From Swiss-Prot:
Subcellular localization(s) per the UniProt record: Cytoplasm
Residues given in the record as Mg(2+) binding sites: 227, 248
Name the UniProt record assigns to this protein: tRNA modification GTPase MnmE
Alphabetical list of SUPFAM superfamilies matching this protein: Folate-binding domain, P-loop containing nucleoside triphosphate hydrolases, TrmE connector domain
GO cellular component, one term: cytoplasm
EC number of the protein: 3.6.-.-
Cofactor binding remark: Binds 1 potassium ion per subunit.
Binding site for GTP: 223-228, 242-248, 267-270
UniProt-listed PANTHER family: TRNA MODIFICATION GTPASE GTPBP3, TRNA MODIFICATION GTPASE GTPBP3, MITOCHONDRIAL
Subunit (UniProt): Homodimer. Heterotetramer of two MnmE and two MnmG subunits.
Task of the protein: Exhibits a very high intrinsic GTPase hydrolysis rate. Involved in the addition of a carboxymethylaminomethyl (cmnm) group at the wobble position (U34) of certain tRNAs, forming tRNA-cmnm(5)s(2)U34.
UniProt-listed Pfam families: MMR_HSR1 (PF01926), MnmE_helical (PF12631), TrmE_N (PF10396)
Alphabetized UniProt keyword annotations: Cytoplasm, GTP-binding, Hydrolase, Magnesium, Metal-binding, Nucleotide-binding, Potassium, tRNA processing
Length: 428
């Protein structure tokens, strides 16, 4: 196994930079640069020198010996001043030792996976934690990174192996009298795992929205204040506003943190009949995005109707509260009237929905768990038909077990790993 190194912090000028080295020669490299013996697991403060003895910097040097490290290999980390010149000099000194190469993106984490320090779901959790923009995303990623989904999958797998072993024993003694009917215990094990997995599958859709973000579309006729409201919600000028109808012709997106949840606000083209080809394209796009949005905020008069039908959770408000005698049920992006109340209502709706999220967060999780669900349903049906069909039930159970192994990355995930690790930085 080669020794690898990389800058683990962001490139550019900073107060502190961290360079990570992992592999069989990591300790050797640390001792060459410090001219000192490193502890098996500890930290020293030392000058760093190149091969000619020139002082490059003073640094905290952390050392971890295999297997008690992030990658499961020997690791040395140099915490030094974040000068671009200092980082470049230390990186060059490491390369000049001739026993290490620059890491590929995500290679440290790949080694942690290969060495059993993380499972695939934890790798995905780490990627999500790095990308987290809101508190809800951070909490969600931490749960996955802690191994919660992997632990669940291992528990399900253990129960299925137990059920399969009972079936296999019965098959092996098919010509003899088996003293105990294993059918009740097998059905109980299979039904329990099936119930748990189905519950997780039901929560994936909401969990995915937390990870990827919710969409809230502002919908209405032209010139009712949609863009002004978007700007008020965003706290900045994100959309052009004017007194002329049809100013907005494209969907304008603003990403924001709404009570800890990731939300993308959509300002859409005004809905109306038009002979303008470009405006017509914008209106069709507005309708498509509004149909897919999690919540639609309709700015409309009481007697107005649209081709887009309201759904549960959608909100309908009267526009331009500042121009009305009675502002009840109305909102104004220009004055801010009703904006705080709208934010609260959107937040409450989304929080109520996220109360039913699951641990699994990705389409991949849902797909592999659905494979297991299908196999388990078939296994239960076959078991109920009697011992003469146990060999078919055993194959269904093995299929369910393989699906769970795929979930945590034990089998057939090379292409997926390449995709995941390509999004990591060099030092991760």
């Amino acid at each position: 196994m080669e020794t690898i190194f990389a800058l683990a912090t962001a490139q550019g000028k900073a107060g502190v930079a961290v360079i990570r080295v992992s592999g069989p020669h990591a300790i050797e490299i640390g001792e060459k640069l410090t001219r000192r013996t490193l502890p098996a697991r500890g930290m020293i403060f030392s000058k760093l020198k190149d091969s000619a003895g020139e002082i490059l910097d003073e640094a905290l040097v952390l050392s971890f010996t295999s297997p008690d490290s992030f990658t499961g290999e020997n690791i040395v980390e140099f915490q030094l001043h974040g000068s671009i010149a200092v980082v470049s000099a230390v990186m060059s000194a490491i390369e000049e030792t001739g026993v290490a190469r620059l890491a590929d993106p995500g290679e440290f984490t790949r080694r942690a996976l290969d060495n059993g320090k993380l499972d695939l779901t934890q790798v995905e959790g780490l990627a999500d934690l790095i990308d987290a923009e809101t508190e809800a995303q951070r909490k969600q990623a931490q749960v996955i990174l802690a191994g919660t989904l992997g632990d669940l999958a291992d528990r399900w797998r253990t129960d299925l192996i137990r059920a399969a072993s009972l079936i296999e024993v019965t098959i092996d003694f098919a010509d003899e009298e088996v003293p105990v009917d294993v059918t009740p215990e097998v059905k109980q094990l299979l039904s329990g795992v099936l119930h748990d997995i189905e519950k997780e599958v039901d929560g994936v859709a909401i969990a995915e929205r937390i990870r990827e973000g919710f969409e809230v579309a502002i919908v209405g006729s032209p010139n009712v204040g949609k863009s002004t409201l978007l700007n008020a919600l965003a706290g900045r000028t994100a959309a052009i506003t004017s007194e002329y109808a049809g100013t907005t012709r494209d969907v304008i997106e603003v990403r924001m943190d709404l009570a800890g949840l990731p939300v993308t606000l959509l300002d859409t083209a005004g809905l109306r009949e038009t002979d303008d080809h470009v405006e017509g394209i914008g209106i069709r796009l507005a309708q498509e995005r509004a149909e897919r949005a999690d919540i639609r905020v309709f700015l409309a008069e009481e007697d107005e109707s649209f081709s887009i039908q309201m759904r549960e959770g959608d909100l309908r408000l009267l526009p331009k509260a500042d121009e009305r005698r009675s502002a009840k049920g109305a909102i104004s992006g220009r004055t801010g009237q009703g904006v705080d109340d709208l934010v609260s209502r959107i937040s409450d709706t989304l929080r109520n929905r996220t109360a039913h999220d699951g641990i699994a967060t990705r389409a991949r999780h849902r797909e592999t768990m659905n494979r297991a669900v299908l196999s388990l349903r078939q296994a239960i049906e076959v078991v109920e038909q009697g011992p003469e069909f146990y060999d078919l039930a055993a194959e269904d159970m093995r299929s369910a077990i393989r699906a769970l192994e795929l979930l945590v990355g034990r089998i057939n995930v090379e292409n997926l790993l390449d995709e995941i690790f390509s999004s990591f930085c060099l030092g991760k």
